[in-house]
Amino acid sequence: MADDAGATEAQGDQCTPAQSLGRLLKLPLPPPRIRTRPWWFPVQELRDPLVFYLEAWLADSIFGPDRAIIPEIEWMSQVLLTVDIVNSGDLVEITIFGRPRVQNRVKSVLLSLANWHRKHRARAEKMNQLEEFLKTHASGPQTPEHRIV
């Protein structure tokens, strides 16, 4: 999903609402949201969730494309996480249930991971630009600037 959006942005195309709707209709349905509360999670901590938003490609990088990392994060931090796609797949809503201090700690960890992935992606884009620049300029004549007589 994030790859499709990235490819569209890279081409510079503007998706029309009809194309966007067509893409959404082709996507598989999300898994059902029926979920039982783990035995280790107290009911009273479901009252006040912490909610924040990230770009979808960051959520794919942090949690994996199929969100396989979420149960491990929940078990290790003793929180419950939900990651829901909003805004036509451009953003995800991350909801953290748990004790307030733990919620803030998990949010801080996730935002730190998001920042690292942003920097890593920017660095990779700069390296690709540098490689392209070097390829285009390396094809010219290779004559030394200063001749030794």
UniProtKB/Swiss-Prot annotation:
Component of the subcortical maternal complex (SCMC), at least composed of NLRP5, KHDC3, OOEP, and TLE6. Within the complex, interacts with NLRP5, KHDC3 and TLE6. As part of the SCMC interacts with the SCMC-associated protein NLRP4F. The SCMC may facilitate translocation of its components between the nuclear and cytoplasmic compartments. Forms a scaffold complex with KHDC3/FILIA, and interacts with BLM and TRIM25 at DNA replication forks. Component of the subcortical maternal complex (SCMC), a multiprotein complex that plays a key role in early embryonic development. The SCMC complex is a structural constituent of cytoplasmic lattices, which consist in fibrous structures found in the cytoplasm of oocytes and preimplantation embryos. They are required to store maternal proteins critical for embryonic development, such as proteins that control epigenetic reprogramming of the preimplantation embryo, and prevent their degradation or activation. GO terms for molecular function: RNA binding; structural constituent of cytoplasmic lattice. It comes from Felis catus (Cat). Keywords: Cytoplasm, Nucleus. This is Oocyte-expressed protein homolog. Residues 49-110 form the KH domain. Contains an atypical KH domain with amino acid changes at critical sites, suggesting that it may not bind RNA. The keyword Metal-binding does not apply. One of its GO terms (cellular component) is cytoplasm.
